[in-house]
């Protein structure tokens, strides 16, 4: 029970940073804050037994640090997706559920530089469904609640974009 509380408390810090990121304007500030978010979310996953989620968050930190310095190219995206798969391959003890963070990170990494607001929101929705399933499996209730809120805000955003185009 103590690890459940500790893991969820650590994840809460990451979730609060995620909310703060919504107020940041500069890409560099967002990437740095996302590194802090991923550190807390990753440690929360690790405490709760979610090893592949931890690895995905660590690779996301590395990806963000590299993208702060270098241009985001398809070769770099493919490299990070492959790194994600290679590092996670030994941590798939929970079966298909272990693949969800890996697939979510791969999808987001590939689509993160899209110019289409609609496409990005749909990608975020898809990845959040994967993370929600994973977080519920590992009893990360705090992250699950924020996953749902992220999905709702993106659905509202999609609705607003569609009304603007109509």
Predicted regions and their residues:
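Alpha-helical membrane-protein topology signature
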Residues: 1-166
